[in-house]
From Swiss-Prot:
InterPro entries: CtaG/Cox11_dom_sf, Cyt_c_oxidase_assmbl_CtaG. It comes from Paracoccus denitrificans. It comes from the Bacteria. One of its GO terms (cellular component) is plasma membrane. Its main location: membrane. Pfam families: CtaG_Cox11. GO terms for biological process: respiratory chain complex IV assembly. It is a single-pass type II membrane protein. This is Cytochrome c oxidase assembly protein CtaG. The chain crosses the membrane at residues 13-33. Keywords: Cell inner membrane, Cell membrane, Copper, Membrane, Signal-anchor, Transmembrane, Transmembrane helix. Exerts its effect at some terminal stage of cytochrome c oxidase synthesis, probably by being involved in the insertion of the copper B into subunit I. The keyword Cell wall biogenesis/degradation does not apply.
């Protein structure tokens, strides 16, 4: 009888180790899978990236509103240069956002984005966008950043998507750590030991 007990413990330990490995693998895969899922379905307002402008333009119009936010530690003023525009569905449009670095140091930031309502993400296509790369602004620098986009004509064929207004929203986040000014001052005042 004692021969069965160690084998049972070994099996239990192996199963528990397998569960731990499986949970770790699922945790690791969750983020890329969720990103892929959002891009494919437009879930959570995730937009598409298009290679070129739409070749189908309809007479039906849609209104796109623009929203901008900046993380408090960024030190930038960030705003849309126009609050909204009306365009034909399928028409290529360009909107501009303005960013000003209000600090006395270079600051690098990146923009996260989404559209509302969430269902519009599947039909909203960006061709070019400042959000595709990091942006570095020098002290006091002001830039106008374009986003080129269109709303896919398939929107009118989706009977579940009764969308006539879309909000494109960006939030800029700092990507480089703030300069440790106090540490630099402390280093200058510390006595050197020989």
């Amino acid at each position: 009888m004692s021969g069965g007990k160690p084998r049972s413990n070994t099996r239990t330990v192996a199963m528990l180790a397998g569960v731990v490995v499986l949970m770790g693998a699922l945790s690791w895969a969750a983020v890329p899978f969720y990103s892929w899922f959002c891009k494919v379905t437009g879930f959570a307002g995730t937009t598409n990236v298009a290679e070129a402008a739409s070749d189908t333009v309809l007479d039906e119009k849609i209104r796109v509103r623009f929203d901008a936010n900046a993380d408090s530690n960024l030190g930038w003023t960030f705003r849309p240069m126009q609050r909204e525009m009306e365009l034909k569905i399928g028409e290529n449009a360009i909107a501009f956002y303005e960013a000003i670095n209000n600090t006395d140091e270079p600051v690098t930031g990146t923009a996260s984005y989404n559209v509302a309502p969430d269902a519009a993400g599947y039909f909203f296509n960006k061709i070019e966008c400042f959000c595709f790369t990091e942006q570095t602004l020098q002290p006091g620098e002001r830039v106008e950043m374009p986003v080129s986009f269109f709303v896919d004509a398939d929107l009118v064929n989706d009977r579940d998507a009764v969308i006539r207004d879309i909000t494109l929203s960006y939030t800029f986040h700092r990507t480089d750590p703030p300069a440790p000014k106090q540490a630099a001052l402390d280093a200058k005042t510390e006595p050197t030991v020989n």
